[in-house]
A protein has these predicted regions:
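Walker B catalytic acidic pair
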Residues: 103-105
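Conserved NTPase motor "head" modules and their coupling/switch loops across ABC/AAA+ ATPases, GTPases
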Residues: 1-99, 108, 112, 116-128, ...
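H-loop (His-switch) motif in ABC-type P-loop NTPases
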Residues: 132-134
Length: 168
């Protein structure tokens, strides 16, 4: 939770506080007990009424559900921060550094958040990254401003071509 919050805080430049909590419907009982208790009723209904599929992840912006109260940009920032925390977890617990794919993530985000994300992932902590975006000029300006090494490719009609320095 703290890693996720630190990523969100960096991207939003400390403008918002977020939280993430897990709410289990099992409460104090074990999952096995919960499933045993609801088995007869589940058979009658034809589907499971209780279990981990009914648990909730409460995604908060301040004290409110981000899904209802947050803007599209705040929701997108939340998702990106969650994915970056997931990347960090996989990197720390695995034997190899995972690839990071940011597929058209800049849609719905203002320029300052996009720049913060690029600064964050351009550091040494993220390894190899693939970024896709439909707004070339937007991405070019930010990559130039950040000053990190990168290669750019054009994908057109199924063909992948590396762009020359002068094309960027």
């Amino acid at each position: 939770d703290l890693i996720f919050q630190s990523f969100y805080s960096y991207i939003s430049q400390d403008k918002e506080q977020v939280g993430l909590t897990y709410e289990s419907h099992a409460r104090n009982a074990s999952l096995l007990e919960v499933l045993k208790e609801s088995r007869v009723r589940d058979k009658i209904m034809g589907y499971s009424l209780r279990g981990i599929h009914k648990d909730e992840l409460n995604m908060l912006l301040g004290d409110f559900p981000i899904k209802r109260e947050g803007s599209q940009g705040q929701n997108k920032t939340y998702l990106v921060a969650l994915k970056l925390a997931q990347f960090d977890f996989l990197k720390r617990t695995g034997s190899t550094v995972p690839l990071l794919l940011l597929d058209d993530i800049f849609d719905k985000l203002d320029a300052s958040r996009v720049e913060q994300i690029v600064k964050l992932v351009a550091g040494d902590n993220f390894g190899q990254i693939f970024i896709t975006d439909t707004n070339r000029e937007h991405l070019d300006r930010i990559l130039y401003k950040v000053g990190s090494d990168y290669k750019m490719f054009r994908v057109e009609s199924g063909a992948i071509n590396e762009m020359e320095e002068k094309e960027r």
